[in-house]
């Protein structure tokens, strides 16, 4: 009986630790993992930055403004204190530019194998940039990248225009079998 109780306690501990570990990153707002080295999300908390570090992330790229509602002003300091690289590319929500995207892509291309989290406030900007980056630089199909982006949101007209323009500049079509770019109003 004592052995059975000990085994149950060990099993319970293992299950607790497994479930806690499995859900930690998924607790970050709209967290999406695209590959072993690239993820996107909404704004992580200060505590979640430590989780990212513990999971092997080496670079945090932030593409919103530090004065946004749920941002914290010293994220750059917190990230650097954890030993990760920090890149800040402020993207105006209703005026994103191709230059904004290419600044992000350039930072990724300098060290493409560094484990990176791209984030904004709710993962709208970040999932759109992730879509473009994956299609243009990682040879992910439009259908797969779009399905991932649409698990977060369906881009509005402003963002759709940016996406279509950048794809066109790079000789890619936004269209794919089963893809709909209809904007939900």
Can you annotate each of these PLM segments?
Residues 18-117, 131-185:
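Cys-dependent protein tyrosine phosphatase-like superfamily
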């Amino acid at each position: 009986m004592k052995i059975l109780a000990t085994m149950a306690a060990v099993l319970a501990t293992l299950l607790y630790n497994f479930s806690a570990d499995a859900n930690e990153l998924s607790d970050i707002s709209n967290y999406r993992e695209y590959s072993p080295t690239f993820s996107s999300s909404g704004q992580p908390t200060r505590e979640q930055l430590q989780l990212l570090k513990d999971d092997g992330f080496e670079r945090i790229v932030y593409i919103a403004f530090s004065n946004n509602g749920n941002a914290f002003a010293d994220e750059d300091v917190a990230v650097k204190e954890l030993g990760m690289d920090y890149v800040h590319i402020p993207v105006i929500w209703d005026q994103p530019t191709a230059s904004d995207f290419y600044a992000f892509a350039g930072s990724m291309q300098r060290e493409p194998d560094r484990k990176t989290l791209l984030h904004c406030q709710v993962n709208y900007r970040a999932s759109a940039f992730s879509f473009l980056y994956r299609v243009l630089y990682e040879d992910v199909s439009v259908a797969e990248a779009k399905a991932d982006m649409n698990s977060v949101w369906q881009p509005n007209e402003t963002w759709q225009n940016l996406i279509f323009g950048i794809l066109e500049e790079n000789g890619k079509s936004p269209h794919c079998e089963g893809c709909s770019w209809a904007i939900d109003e």
